[in-house]
């Protein structure tokens, strides 16, 4: 049948007698057979970027520039992959099938000033991130999400803001104003399908308490977010700096808040409150990083119990099902850390 390019979702479609059917793109399967860790497998490459070390490390309070890599389909420890342009914590990441972006953050210490820069790397190679020469609209920490063409950054802190910025991943440029979240909040989580981006939870301003709000935007347009529903399982304290993974249809929010193992999920294309998915294996607080394929989500790091120790464990879930998380492996051994920024070349938004 006839072909067309659907600019709303950034995909090619074919006419099937009575409807347009999407032609699915494929992410390149990456891996390094010389490795004996997770990255030795072939499949979706996930990147955990930056973070900072907490007690009892003698370097506690310092951010770092290391980026870890895993193959999402292969259990095992991460490998040292490449480096950010500086030592940052709290930045946001997003990616299409070939390029990863890192934006914002704070460094080189946890008390340093904020960074507005947008940097990028080629996911298939181990070359370091490069400075794009372009910036976010403000220099703050944030969370990122994307479809195959457009990256969004929001849930800013320092100060808390309702701003949403966007960039075109392959052409870059300074971030443009997309719209606003339904409330001012920072430390929220973001997931996406090819059509929608959804923000969930965070810390509200001016109360400085966790919020359970979920709101969404349509990625191909610009405009303010609309109410989606609420995070139900963490309704008492909200959720912030949690793990966030997604398939093309389902978003999953894992842990975070004030020491919680709770995992919630929601269907991205609809609206409504979240439902209980299961529990994480390790009890942690906030500061989690996460990466995913269309079927598996990997959640890593965080603040351990007792605080302020950080943990280097990774655990995984199967996104289309429900159930408890299972041990995946560890972030590289020297890095007991809070990654916060994760992305992959095969997530459900592509």
Indicate where each model-derived feature is located.
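Polar, enzyme-active/binding microenvironments
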Residues: 2-350
């Amino acid at each position: 049948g006839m072909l067309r390019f659907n600019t709303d979702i950034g995909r090619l479609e074919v006419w099937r007698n009575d409807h347009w059917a999407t032609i699915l793109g494929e992410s390149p399967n990456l891996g390094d057979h010389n490795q004996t860790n997770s990255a030795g497998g072939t499949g979706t490459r996930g990147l955990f970027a930056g973070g900072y070390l907490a007690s009892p490390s003698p370097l506690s309070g310092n951010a770092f520039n290391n980026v870890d890599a895993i193959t999402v389909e292969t259990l095992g420890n991460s490998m040292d992959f490449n480096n950010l342009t500086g030592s940052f914590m709290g930045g946001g990441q997003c990616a299409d099938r070939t390029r990863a972006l890192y934006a914002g953050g704070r460094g080189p210490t946890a008390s340093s000033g904020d960074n507005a820069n947008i940097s990028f790397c080629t996911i298939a190679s181990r070359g370091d991130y490069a400075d794009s020469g372009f910036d976010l609209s403000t220099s703050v920490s944030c969370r990122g999400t994307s479809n195959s063409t457009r990256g969004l950054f929001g849930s800013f802190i320092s100060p808390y803001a309702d701003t949403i910025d966007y960039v075109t991943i392959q052409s870059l440029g300074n971030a443009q104003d997309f719209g606003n979240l339904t409330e001012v909040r920072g430390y929220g989580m973001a997931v996406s399908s090819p059509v929608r981006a959804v923000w969930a939870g965070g810390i509200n301003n001016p109360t400085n308490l966790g919020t359970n709000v979920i709101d969404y935007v349509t990625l191909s347009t610009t405009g303010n977010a609309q109410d989606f529903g609420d995070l139900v399982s963490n309704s008492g304290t909200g959720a912030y700096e949690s793990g966030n993974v997604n398939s093309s249809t389902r978003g999953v929010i894992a842990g975070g808040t004030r020491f919680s193992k709770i995992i919630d999920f929601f269907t991205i294309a609809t609206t409504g409150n979240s439902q209980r998915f299961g529990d994480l294996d390790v009890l942690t607080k906030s500061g989690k990083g996460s990466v995913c394929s269309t079927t598996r989500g990997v959640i890593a790091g965080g603040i351990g119990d007792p605080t302020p120790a950080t943990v280097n464990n990774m655990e995984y879930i199967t996104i289309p099902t429900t159930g408890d998380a299972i041990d995946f492996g560890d972030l590289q051994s020297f890095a007991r850390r809070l990654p916060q920024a994760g992305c992959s070349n095969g997530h459900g938004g592509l």
